[in-house]
Amino acid sequence: MRHQYVYAVFPRAYSKSFLSMMVLMIRCILYPKCKLFVTSGGKEQAAGIMKEKVQEICTLIPAFKKEIDWTRGVTLEGKDYCKYVFHSGSYFDNIVARETSRGKRRHGGVIEECATVDGTILSEVIIPTMNVSRLCMDGSTHPEEQLNKSQLYITTAGWKNTFPYDKLIQLLVWQIIKPEKSMVIGGTYRIPVLVKLLDKNFVRDLKMDGTFNEASF
């Protein structure tokens, strides 16, 4: 929330998608008329993540549900497209990591499972959608606002010599140069096991499974 660029690497069951959707919802409430997005390697994947996590958040915290305009035709929940419109005039939806998304305008967003997103499309299509800063309620713009151009990269472990790895190193360097804007965070499977989101016996079985790829966990 307090950083413009965040790169988060966590294992399965760490609630990374849950928390990233909550971040978007909070920003939509606090920043009127902002336009945010979620993208991933597949269109249906992003829509599925959004729908599942938003419904879960609204069930656990009903106050969030009251902030969303559930009028028919306003908030949309489909198989390959979801859009959540808030009473503040803000919204977030999913956009496709393809050439067809060129020309769209958003103020910030989440790149889910960024290890599977094409680096060229991300650099030439997705990131340029954030060229325009949010217009405040008084008609002014504040380019220095943390919301503008905000990029939250979420993924499980990936591989070296790839675009996501290069982006991770870039943000790690920025964290040293400008710590107020950039942050790189990560975690292990021990936290999900500790809070009972992940069964330790299941993790132990995976470790002993010779056919399981550890990098995919």
Residue map of PLM features:
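Phosphate/NTP-binding elements of NTP-utilizing enzymes
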Residues: 1-217
